[in-house]
Amino acid sequence: MTAILEKLTLYWAYPFVRYALVVGVLIALCSSLLGVTLVLKRFSFIGDGLSHVAFGAMAIAAVLQITNEMPLVMVITIISAVLLLRTGQNTKIKGDAAIAMLSVGALAISYLLMNLFSTSSNLSGDVCSTLFGSTSILTLTKSEVWLCAVLSVAVVAVFVLCYNKIFAVTFDENFAKAVGTKADLYNLLIAITIAVVIVLAMNLVGSLLISALVIFPALSAMRVYKNFRAVTICAAVLSVCCAALGILISILAGTPVGSTIVAVDIFAFLISSGISRLGGIRT
């Protein structure tokens, strides 16, 4: 135990380790807050669809040789979130079908672009890093940490300020509309916010694993709590703890950051499921 603490203390002296912890915790917090709403609205896989769009946007940025791809990826992902929301309201194309269509199409086209216009000698490595997150935590820069911090504060502020409206839209959208709540506006706000979170999480866990950050903490919290506020708080705490623990384990074991965080999330879900079966906390 002493050796582990000494090793962690040694690593803590390096800025990139602190950057990874800060970014991981912030992304986990934002993902969990939105995850509860998305799971309850049965729109969990919007994260999966938009993450593949973000992957496609990164492929376009690579083809155009854009060094700072964040603005382009952010714009394309937000536009796709808006279009996905509008398409999901179409009676001819249901929400799940629209997400599946967008997800598979974006993934196929982006990989095709990366093959046809490859600007890297290590295409498979680039694709793996984008899909599953960076295998090294050395990739985070100070500017990325600050950008993540600012956007994370904005996401949390939106959720806190609009909590009552989001709660109403989540549980009974028709009733919310009947009492004058602009449900479409808040659905749009949720879609844009999740798009921002997905772009932020790309470097940490990769496009294929982002949905895990959104879904697992929410499902784990729902196993032990029934109250919306309690579920939201529990999901946030669980997500932050799992992210921090996953990053620390990846540092000590030398494993990929994103995959390790998701593995810890899965373990937490199994524990919460066990507590639920034993008749644990239900408030």
Feature map (PLM): residue ranges:
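Transmembrane helix-bundle core of multi-pass membrane transporters
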Residues: 4-10, 99, 103-160
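Hydrophobic alpha-helical transmembrane segments
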Residues: 21-25, 70-75, 97-101, 145-150, ...
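Cytosolic-side transmembrane-helix boundaries in multi-pass membrane proteins
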Residues: 255-262, 266-283
